[in-house]
Amino acid sequence: SRTAREVVGIDYSQAFIDAANGMRAAGTARVSRLEEASLQSELEVAVPRGVCPERITFEQGDAMDLRGDLGNFDRVLAANLLCRLREPAKLLARLPDLVKPGGELVLTTPCTWLEEFTPPANWPAADTSAWLKSELDESFELTAEHDEPFLIRETARKFQWTVAMLTVWRRR
């Protein structure tokens, strides 16, 4: 973190947490990326300058069942997560406890609701934006909403272009 006193990163994947902890400890990591077929290239990635890794912790966790003593924060980011949860409403219900009054909640989602991740009964009844407003309005005020494009490299010649909906909320 450059500015926050404390950052807690949580992911469901223990492999992602192990990789993040390795980067935090070493400052760099060697990674392989697929070029084509079975051809790979090696890269070295580094923690950006000015980041204070000693302020950051990483832990494995389930966004629908976060530990009770996690505390609350000035800012919470849930990135590209909602439409990958079996019960996304569970996370939304927990968010008021995680964000301090006056704090900020940032949600991004590509709104790609798929049965393999979320049963259709748990999808928004309307569009995702309207659903979020109805679920969060009691505890949060929507302060911004816009599209946030991102690109995922699959191979040297194949990329996945996606546009996520980004919403920013202020805790009442």
Task: For the regions a language model picked out, list residue spans one by one.
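Conserved SAM-binding loop of SAM-dependent methyltransferases across substrates and taxa
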Residues: 1-4
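Conserved beta-strand signature within the Rossmann-like core of class I S-adenosyl-L-methionine
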Residues: 102-111
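S-adenosyl-L-methionine
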Residues: 22-66
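Core SAM-dependent methyltransferase catalytic element
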Residues: 138-141, 145-172
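Conserved Class I S-adenosyl-L-methionine
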Residues: 31-43, 118-147
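A conserved beta-strand element that flanks and buttresses the S-adenosyl-L-methionine
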Residues: 77
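A short glycine-rich, Lys/Arg-flanked "PGG" loop and its adjoining helix->strand segment in the class I
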Residues: 89-102
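Conserved SAM/SAH-binding beta-strand->alpha-helix loop
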Residues: 13
